A protein has these predicted regions:
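Membrane metalloprotein/metal-transporter helix-bundle signature
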Residues: 2-198
Length: 198
């Protein structure tokens, strides 16, 4: 179980939020605010996105310190690349299947408390992040800039990662990790449902 100081979590959260919020703040106007709000709401409005983002944080809480930091950073970074690919007109076959599969796989990784080195864990997260980012990029509202919309969904994603990371850490302190693994199993079951519904 990773022991991440609360001060470090707060600093990381503040830095990431400030970084991804800069594009939205640089262009004042109602359409930019609406774009940011729409992007922020997108990961929160769908169970597939919501569960996957939380699962990344929960899985990070089960890793050693380097991976505990790397996973929540890698996901939003690759997600942005996926959104840019969508905006540029590139096709990503079976993106929705990849998103549903991410809930199943990430849930299983949490359920079995799988520990991976960076060379194994980061590609897994990156693959699923690209699918989530592509879906976000395909949903940019008319009249909204990709930068402000993207800032919104990145902020929401980082918040969900941090929520999963902190919750996972606190739960493991109190229940020796069994409750976190149970959450992972529930998420995996949700992933099966999402895959069956496609």
């Amino acid at each position: 179980m990773v022991q991440v100081p609360r001060r470090k979590i707060a600093q990381l959260s503040a830095a990431l939020t400030a970084l991804v919020s800069m594009p939205a703040l640089a262009h004042p106007g109602m359409h930019h605010i609406a774009g940011f709000a729409s992007g922020f709401a997108h990961p929160l409005a769908g169970w597939d996105h919501l569960l996957a983002m939380l699962a990344v944080g929960l899985w990070a809480s089960q890793q050693r310190r380097t991976m505990a930091v790397a996973l929540p950073l890698a996901f939003p970074l690759v997600m942005v690349l996926g959104a840019l690919a969508a905006a540029a007109g590139y096709a990503l076959p079976a993106a929705e299947t990849g998103i549903a599969a991410s809930v199943l796989v990430l849930g299983l990784l949490v359920a079995f408390a799988v520990k991976m080195p960076a060379w194994g864990g980061l590609p897994v997260v990156a693959l699923f992040a690209a699918a989530h980012g592509y879906a976000h990029g395909m949903e940019v509202p008319a009249g909204s800039a990709l930068a402000t919309y993207g800032a919104g969904f990145v902020v929401a994603t980082v918040m969900l990662h941090l929520a999963g990371l902190v919750a996972g850490h606190l739960i493991q302190v109190r229940s020796a990790g069994n409750a976190v693994r149970a959450l992972g199993a529930s998420m995996a079951a949700g992933g099966v449902y999402l895959l069956a519904a496609i």
